Amino acid sequence: MNHSIAMGNLEDLVNAAIKLFDNAESIVDLEQIKAQYLGKTGEITILLKGLRELTPEERPVMGERINQAKKLLEDALIERRNLIQEKNMSARLAEESLDVSLPGRGLGMGGVHPVTRTLIRIESLFHSIGFGVATGPEIETDFYNFTALNIAENHPARAMHDTFYVDGGKLLRTHTSPVQIHYMQNHRPPIKIIAPGRVYRCDSDVTHTPMFHQVEGLWIDENVSFSALKGVLVEFMRNFFEKDNLSVRFRPSFFPFTEPSAEMDIACVMCNGKGCRVCGETGWLEVLGCGMVHPNVMNHVGLDSEEHIGFAFGLGVERLAMLRYGVNDLRLFFENDLRFLKQFN
């Protein structure tokens, strides 16, 4: 390689490369030019590899010149890249301009789910009249869910279409009554509790879901009467719906774990008892089942049914939430639609 010719070519090469860098309009263009001159097969790289063809006297001189040229190109590349990036940022800021005079956006806040809100209200009202709260497992045995509650082996509630059975002879509780059995086994009267929680049944439609919430109540003592049961439930319903003149009625019914048993109706809160689609034009809405605890249940937990007496009741939390908030489809509570849920906050 002729020394003077190589030097002339090197100067032309640097000038041409810098001109290309200065005319580049994008980072992509810069990378292509960089590869052309500074890449593994670029022209500067080829010149550096050609140093071995020079004489020992020429090699250090040309090596220094080529490295200087390489440094000039790298500086030009960095300068142009910074310029293009600043230009791109300015254009982006112009497109996404921020008006600092606008008020700030607050952080979104969550709210209490309407079913949870209803459950809290129920617990608070019963707590105000002396009831404690008891909880228990959601996976139960046949004994606690059925046998101890006087539900015979051939009772329809034990069928697969009503109950979720799991391995090991266990099942998902179909009501929170098992909590009462656990509690009575471990506590002596007087007993005055409610048992809120999730329960499970094989059912799904407009008014039923496979999982829902119940609150069951129990009062065991020496002189608890059916009139006390009526007084507690009437007081609760009138406070829950905030209607002091709410009409109620008790109808005879049957439950294996209570005797006598009754179902409680209230005057339809949608039409004030006049009759509408919600109440089936009857003017009444069924809200809960209740009764005096059956002697067989007492015997299963070791209590003397001659000495102690009590009442029990059970109500659906979603049912009361639907009536309180005017919701006509139970499934809306579990679809996680924020448009629906935000109405309650």
UniProtKB/Swiss-Prot annotation:
The keyword Cytoplasm applies. Disulfide bonds: none annotated. It comes from the Bacteria. HAMAP family: Phe_tRNA_synth_alpha1. It catalyses: tRNA(Phe) + L-phenylalanine + ATP = L-phenylalanyl-tRNA(Phe) + AMP + diphosphate + H(+). The gene is pheS. Tetramer of two alpha and two beta subunits. This is Phenylalanine--tRNA ligase alpha subunit. Its cofactor is Mg(2+). Its EC number is 6.1.1.20.
